[in-house]
């Protein structure tokens, strides 16, 4: 295919109609380099201002040289380029999260409203097949979306209808690690798909067809259920169990970054059926609120309320307090991080001691006053000790003692960790 053919496809689809500035995620591979060539050549026709963003993962000897070459490429094209270096323990998931966090920073800094990636049809096949093997919920088998709105930005994948073989051979960098089968996606690409294509030469087309069919069903159900108020439980429960599940799943599609597992979805169903009033965080900064025959799922407002020497910390929030950084459900990195098992079900209270405080230790209730005396804790330290409380019980006296019979929950929605780092040394 010729470059003008790709331009015509972009114009026909109207990918950039609503955008004046676009950030291109530039890895240096063939697909992203060719997308760079098309977008930079036809900026005027597409009416966009192009900005480049690259993440140096620091995993290969060639990484730094490739970064320098991309800087030269950007300078020759007279385009701005932003580069960030990945650090820490490498994993596919951590690297992906790092990239998208960085891309959003670049967009915020530049005022861009579109993020463009070079995902193509081969990536789509691999993604759908990976999710199928992992047992992902049906709606996620529709694969990567061509256009996806996340908050105030739109992710655009204009190559999703093309295969890698459609791209001309131009200057690019080869990542030799793609040939190694250490990572799951590489095993899919290098081993599983080629073997299955021996059984069915059109296996890739079959996978893409399934993904498109699931997407059609998903969109049709959303359209047909548009006038059903799923948040009205009386209305929801008037349908069969099967229809309830489909309607609830369609409702959850409104929250693309929620991503409940099958077990978590089943628990939400159970809560809606069994609890008259309920409120608790569920996942990724969302909470479920139920009041009799109504419910809603919404984002938890980031906040930490401080009243009368007491701080209330909500799930998936962080706060610095009296020389410590407290992180509720968000891991901290470092050698001296304390970890306390807690629950997502309710907020954590951090305070100083009160008269009558009791800690459960080894199955016995012990007054803090007596505990401090037994441990020979100085008066000054007693008064400054931070008490961590949840469900009305003391979970821990920071640096002194922990309730080893703190509430234990049975499901993966409710279990989490409070991470604590001393920041005032």
Curated annotation (Swiss-Prot):
Name of one Pfam family that matches: TilS_C
Protein purpose: Ligates lysine onto the cytidine present at position 34 of the AUA codon-specific tRNA(Ile) that contains the anticodon CAU, in an ATP-dependent manner. Cytidine is converted to lysidine, thus changing the amino acid specificity of the tRNA from methionine to isoleucine.
EC number: 6.3.4.19
GO cellular component annotations of the record: cytoplasm
Top EC group: ligase
Single GO MF annotation: tRNA(Ile)-lysidine synthase activity
UniProt keywords, alphabetically: ATP-binding, Cytoplasm, Ligase, Nucleotide-binding, tRNA processing
Compartments where located: Cytoplasm
Name by which UniProt lists this protein: tRNA(Ile)-lysidine synthase
InterPro entries reported for this sequence: Lysidine-tRNA-synth_C (IPR012796), Rossmann-like_a/b/a_fold (IPR014729), TilS/TtcA_N (IPR011063), tRNA_Ile_lys_synt (IPR012094), tRNA_Ile_lys_synt_N (IPR012795)
GO BP term, example: tRNA modification
Chief subcellular location: cytoplasm
Entry-linked HAMAP family: tRNA_Ile_lys_synt
Family statement drawn from the similarity comment of this UniProt entry: Belongs to the tRNA(Ile)-lysidine synthase family.
Reaction it catalyzes: cytidine(34) in tRNA(Ile2) + L-lysine + ATP = lysidine(34) in tRNA(Ile2) + AMP + diphosphate + H(+)
Organism: Streptococcus pneumoniae serotype 4 (strain ATCC BAA-334 / TIGR4)
UniProt binding sites for ATP: 27-32
Domain commentary: The N-terminal region contains the highly conserved SGGXDS motif, predicted to be a P-loop motif involved in ATP binding.
């Amino acid at each position: 295919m010729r470059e003008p053919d790709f331009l015509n496809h972009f114009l026909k689809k109207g990918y950039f109609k609503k955008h004046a500035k676009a950030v291109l995620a530039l890895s240096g591979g063939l697909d992203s380099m060719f997308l760079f060539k098309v977008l930079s050549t036809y900026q005027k026709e597409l009416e966009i201002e192009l900005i480049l963003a690259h993440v140096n993962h620091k995993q290969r000897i060639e990484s730094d040289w490739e970064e320098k070459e991309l800087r030269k490429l950007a300078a020759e094209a007279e385009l701005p380029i932003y580069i960030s270096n990945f650090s820490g323990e490498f994993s596919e998931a951590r690297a992906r999260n790092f990239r998208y966090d960085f891309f959003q920073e670049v967009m915020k800094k530049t005022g861009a409203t579109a993020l463009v990636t070079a995902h193509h049809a081969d990536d789509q096949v691999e993604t759908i097949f990976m999710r199928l093997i992992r047992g992902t919920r049906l709606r996620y088998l529709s694969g990567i979306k061509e256009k996806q709105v996340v908050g105030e930005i739109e992710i655009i994948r204009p190559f999703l209808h093309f295969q890698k073989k459609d791209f001309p051979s131009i200057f690019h960098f080869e990542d030799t690690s793609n040939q190694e089968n250490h990572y799951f996606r590489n095993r899919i690409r290098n081993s599983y798909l080629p073997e299955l294509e021996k059984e069915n030469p059109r296996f890739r087309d079959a996978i893409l067809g399934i993904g498109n069919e699931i997407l059609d069903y998903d969109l049709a159900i959303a359209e047909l259920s548009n006038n059903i108020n799923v948040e009205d439980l009386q209305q929801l429960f008037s349908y069969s169990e099967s229809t309830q599940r489909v309607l609830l799943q369609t409702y959850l599609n409104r929250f693309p970054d929620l991503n409940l597992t099958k077990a978590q979805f089943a628990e939400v169903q159970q809560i809606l059926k069994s609890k008259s009033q309920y409120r608790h965080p569920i996942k990724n900064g969302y909470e479920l609120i139920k009041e009799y025959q109504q419910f809603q799922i919404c984002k938890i407002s980031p906040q930490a309320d401080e009243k009368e020497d007491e701080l209330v910390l909500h799930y998936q929030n962080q706060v610095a307090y009296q020389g410590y950084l407290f992180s509720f459900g968000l891991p901290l990195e470092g050698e001296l991080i304390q970890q306390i098992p807690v629950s997502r079900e309710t907020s954590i209270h951090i305070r100083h001691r009160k008269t009558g405080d009791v800690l459960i230790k080894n199955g016995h209730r012990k007054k803090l006053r007596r505990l401090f005396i037994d441990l020979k804790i100085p008066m000054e330290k007693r008064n400054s000790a931070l008490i961590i409380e949840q469900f009305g019980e003391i979970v821990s006296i920071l640096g002194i003692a922990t309730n080893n019979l703190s509430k234990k929950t049975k499901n993966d929605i409710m279990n989490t960790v409070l991470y604590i780092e001393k920041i005032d040394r």
